Amino acid sequence: MENKSIPQATSPLAAWLSYLENLHSKTIDMGLERVSQVAARLDVLKPAPFVFTVAGTNGKGTTCRTLESVLMAAGYKVGVYSSPHLVRYTERVRVQNSELPESAHTASFAEIEAARGEISLTYFEYGTLSALWLFKQAQLDVVILEVGLGGRLDATNMVDADVAVVTSIALDHVDWLGPDRESIGREKAGIFRANKPAVVGEPDMPHTIADVANEKGARLLRRGVDWNYEVKDNGWRFSDARGALDNLPLPQVPQPNAATALAALRASGLAVSEQAIRDGIQSAILPGRFQIVSESPRLILDVAHNPHAAAYLAGRLKSLSKTGRVLAVIGMLHDKDIGGTLACMESVVDSWYCAPLEGPRGATAEQLMEHLGKGAIYSSVAQAWHAAMADAKPEDTVLVCGSFHTVAHVMEAMDAGRTGGE
């Protein structure tokens, strides 16, 4: 697959992304040997003085965002690498909560292309190296890496984390990570390091996580054992070995993820004031995570795509003050647990608007309908969303969920509507 015409530092980002997508024989190729060799050549294995690495089935993005928000409130210069993106590739790398220009990414890709020689890299490995290179150039205090898939063999794990975080463990990506929570837990705990904090937000922790912590000599900090949180009427309380923080502001991200981020921050030893914690928690929001875009009708975007996330989403919907119906625009990938995910939502959704997702992994609208037995079929996510918005009364809620791709399509349709495009 080599010898395609190689883009240059000044080539458009789209040309580079097309090149990267076709560079390696496999889309996913787990293992650290190839990517670590290139990282060593680029000298990016220590992208900042302090690194957090965040793994987990759900909640990684909002945990990273909370860490970023609090650390910035405390005066640190912070970089975050996350995936997948919703609308633009540049979302994947944030420096001080801002995306970098496309030209920065293409310059970085050119550096990696020059350094890799004959070593073949996947799209994700290339992107990870690029993020590390960009962070190194930015001279940051802290870098936060969101694991792409699993942990042990994920490209992010070539970097030694000063604090490792596992947010939650549920069944997803079983083809790659194993058939049960124990196998998945072992893979995710692969990011742990000797004598470093390993913070686990999953309340029902598989024993394999403790096994790996013991094998590696990591300092395991478990929710409900070493730290905990409790939601009160108008705030919440966090407690760990260092003491308690009372009357914290309720976060806009899921509560367990804000608490897990706080546990990781307090385990890090980084100087962070209580005021920075309060300010950072309040300002942390992330697109596509129970994102309320508008009211009358209320429009909510959520990337929930497995039963664990869908159950949380259903609970959030039940807690909203509402009098009208919930109209759900749904599109999913066929390798997800479609039946289990939809079953978690059925009690809170009144009408389903089923749409296909394109590409080899996309489920058809008909496949979704097989599980639901009711609803309407549309030819695209945008068409389903337009139909739901047209049907919605001011008191209703339109929910868009099922995949990052589904939410991205609606965001793009909203942008097109604002700019008068198609």
Predicted features along the sequence, with ranges:
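C-terminal helical cap/extension that packs against the catalytic core
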Residues: V199, P203-G217, K232-G235, R266, ...
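Nucleotide phosphate-binding/pyrophosphate-handling subdomain across enzymes
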Residues: A48-F50, Q137, V142-V147, D154-V165, ...
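ATP-dependent carboxylate-amine ligase catalytic core
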Residues: P7-Q8, P12, K26-I28, L32-P49, ...
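Beta-strand->loop->alpha-helix junctions that form or flank phosphate-binding loops
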Residues: Y81-P84, V200-E202, N214-V231, L248-Q252, ...
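Extended acidic/charged loop-beta regions that coordinate divalent cations
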Residues: P84, R88, G127-W176, H207-A244
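Membrane-proximal helix-turn-helix segments that form the acceptor-binding/catalytic region
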Residues: G185-A194
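A conserved segment at the C-terminal end of the G1
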Residues: F50-V54, T62-G79
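Active-site-proximal loop/hinge segments that shape catalytic or ion-binding/gating pockets
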Residues: S403
